[in-house]
């Protein structure tokens, strides 16, 4: 977290100057995994409101899109075996997109800064309501920049102009 500068330390006087801004707290969540315990700093964004429900969730592909990918990968093309189908798991996905809003949080106890300081987010943390959608938008932007075209029927299905589904 320190190498990525997920947040910038600021004086509290500037963080909550706007009375409409809720004070966002954070806490560590430990999960037992096969390789040991994984700790994750999670925001407790309870008072996000329901003003913009469309922006809360990342887009996910419908089952039909997954079936299309698998059938395209398994289909023989000009006598050759099907294509490779690879899946990836992006580690710390929510920490990749930059935070485009002014979002302030209380610092965890072990963070630099001490009392009288808060953190302004540079990148999203798990637990913030818009984080999943921001990751989906960030990922889509990277694919489009790499030459993929967004599908017409499914916005999360990307196709390379050469005809290869990705």
Predicted segments — roles?
Residues 1-141, 145-152:
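Chromodomain-type histone methyl-lysine reader module
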Residues 161-166:
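Short, intrinsically disordered, charge-balanced linker/junction segments flanking boundaries
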């Amino acid at each position: 977290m320190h190498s990525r500068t997920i947040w910038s330390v600021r004086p509290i006087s500037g963080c909550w100057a706007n009375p409409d801004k809720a004070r966002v707290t954070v806490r560590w969540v430990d999960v037992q995994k096969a390789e040991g315990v994984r700790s994750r700093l999670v925001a407790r964004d309870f008072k996000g409101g329901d003003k913009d429900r469309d922006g809360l969730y990342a887009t996910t592909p419908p089952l039909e899109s997954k079936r299309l990918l698998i059938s395209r990968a398994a289909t023989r093309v000009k006598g050759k075996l099907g294509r490779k189908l690879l899946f990836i798991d992006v580690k710390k996905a929510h920490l990749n997109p930059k935070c485009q809003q002014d979002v302030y949080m209380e610092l965890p106890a072990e963070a630099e800064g001490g009392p009288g300081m808060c953190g302004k987010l540079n990148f999203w943390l798990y637990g913030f309501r818009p984080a999943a959608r921001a990751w989906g938008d960030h990922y889509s932007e990277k694919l489009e920049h790499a030459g993929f075209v967004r599908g017409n029927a499914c916005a999360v299905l990307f196709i390379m102009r050469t005809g290869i589904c990705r």
